[in-house]
């Protein structure tokens, strides 16, 4: 069935056209259903623009006063949920402008002087994204604080370190968690760096070529807290690289949290049993009464794919566009909004979930006995006695094979049995083969010795203060 055009009010741009837009096209092209969440940023940008227009003598002081009065009322209506969003008015910008004009008359019609929706929306997005980044950085800090608390409580709690999911060498649980702290530190650095490029003002670029009005872009930048203006009008309205950069930083952060989630899931499994997770982060089964499922970490893994998808969506959106603005760019907002929402929700729940970890230290220690975790320490011991490393490696490999055949761990061998693999072995070898001895020997910066883990936590807290 062919869609027909219904009677509708004139568009802000309708003078050029001989027939109204069809209902189908109207629905297909409207963005107000999702870009209305930038309403407060749109009002902030419009107020700064109006103040600049009045300062430059482009509109009168009474016009500015009327615009400010109208915007106060509109802001209140939006905050109270009373604002009537209208699909006929396409987007957040025209909805607010139309309401302003209804409230104050001609001053509302003068607001758009020297401005296009192209630079207006670019400004709104940057203001919105700047606010989102600030919230994300605060949440990363909260997550880090709680992570450091758990790491400090377990700075000396031994557990297996793994490679290829095989027991490799002893580490401490605190040291393991500090690896994720370092990842989150880099995540915060990326968002902080991204914010610098977000914080540039596009307003004044107008549609694409600038404007003939004597505007003062630097004044608007100061009013809105931007560090500087965008230096090329075409670039200002047509690129969304700052949004792509934000999504890339988000994808990396979510990837790090996804890896931690995978470990929490494994550690919580009865087959591993290293931790338990507070009940408030788990769910049960509708059929199996014994189940306690780690749904939150599993959803973090799943939502990481969602954020990765948004990054690819934005890259694909931009890759074939000629300069300057194209309607394609309307599709930037939903992936961007969804990414920010997902990251914020994930960080909020993760900051709490970290505090809900209950460590099963005995299970961690028992696991160290199953994989010959101190074999490398024995090899290093022989090297320090003068044996070349490759020869020491071979001697210890033979000892491990013998231990497997006997069904014991290396510290369970007698001194004579160990000497059968190398005459360099002395009575001091048993101190080397203990878990505590292995941990204590990694006493350099970045090592897993408990005092080094505590020092790393102290440094981290100092930088986070």
From Swiss-Prot:
Pathway: Amino-acid biosynthesis; L-arginine biosynthesis; L-arginine from L-ornithine and carbamoyl phosphate: step 3/3. Its main location: cytoplasm. This is Argininosuccinate lyase. It is found in: Cytoplasm. NCBIfam families: argH. Belongs to the lyase 1 family. Argininosuccinate lyase subfamily. One of its GO terms (molecular function) is argininosuccinate lyase activity. GO terms for biological process: arginine biosynthetic process via ornithine; L-arginine biosynthetic process. PANTHER family: ARGININOSUCCINATE LYASE. Its EC number is 4.3.2.1.
């Amino acid at each position: 069935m062919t869609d027909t055009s219904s009677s509708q009010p004139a568009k802000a741009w309708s003078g050029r056209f001989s027939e109204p837009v069809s209902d189908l096209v109207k629905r297909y092209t409207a963005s107000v259903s999702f870009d209305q969440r930038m309403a407060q940023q749109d009002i902030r940008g419009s107020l700064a623009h109006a103040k600049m227009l009045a300062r430059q003598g482009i509109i009168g002081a009474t016009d500015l006063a009327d615009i400010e009065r109208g915007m106060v009322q509109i802001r209140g209506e939006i905050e109270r949920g009373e604002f009537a969003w209208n699909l006929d008015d396409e987007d957040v910008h025209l909805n607010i402008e139309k309401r302003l004009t209804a409230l104050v008359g001609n001053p509302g019609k003068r607001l758009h002087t020297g401005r296009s929706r192209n630079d207006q929306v670019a400004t709104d997005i940057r203001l919105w994204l700047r606010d989102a980044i600030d919230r994300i950085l605060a949440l990363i800090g909260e997550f880090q604080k709680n992570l450091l608390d758990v790491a400090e409580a377990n700075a000396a709690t031994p557990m297996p370190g793994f490679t290829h999911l095989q027991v490799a060498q002893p580490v401490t649980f605190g040291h393991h968690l500090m690896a994720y702290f370092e990842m989150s530190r880099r995540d915060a650095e990326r968002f902080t760096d991204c914010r610098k490029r977000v914080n540039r003002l596009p307003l004044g670029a107008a549609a694409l070529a600038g404007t003939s009005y004597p505007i003062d872009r630097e004044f608007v930048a100061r009013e809105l807290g931007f560090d500087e203006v965008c230096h090329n009008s075409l670039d200002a309205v047509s690129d969304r690289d700052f949004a792509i950069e934000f999504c890339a930083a988000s994808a990396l952060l979510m990837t790090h949290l996804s890896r931690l989630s995978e470990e929490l899931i494994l550690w919580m499994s009865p087959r591993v049993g290293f931790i338990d997770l507070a009940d408030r982060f788990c769910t049960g089964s509708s059929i199996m009464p014994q189940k306690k499922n780690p749904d939150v970490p599993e959803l973090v893994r799943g939502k990481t794919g969602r954020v990765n998808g948004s990054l690819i969506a934005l890259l694909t959106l931009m890759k074939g566009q000629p300069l300057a603005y194209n309607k394609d760019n309307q599709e930037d907002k939903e992936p961007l909004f969804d990414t920010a929402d997902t990251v914020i929700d994930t960080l909020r729940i993760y900051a709490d979930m970290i505090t809900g970890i209950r460590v099963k230290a005995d299970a961690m220690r028992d696991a160290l006995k199953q994989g010959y975790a101190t074999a490398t320490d024995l090899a290093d011991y022989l090297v320090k006695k003068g044996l070349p490393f490759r020869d020491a490696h071979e001697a210890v490999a033979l000892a491990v094979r013998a231990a497997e055949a006997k069904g014991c761990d290396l510290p369970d061998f007698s001194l004579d049995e160990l000497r059968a693999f190398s005459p360099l072995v002395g009575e001091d070898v048993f101190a080397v083969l203990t878990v505590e001895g292995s941990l204590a020997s990694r006493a350099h910066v970045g090592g897993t010795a408990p005092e080094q883990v505590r020092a790393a936590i102290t440094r981290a807290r100092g930088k986070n203060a």
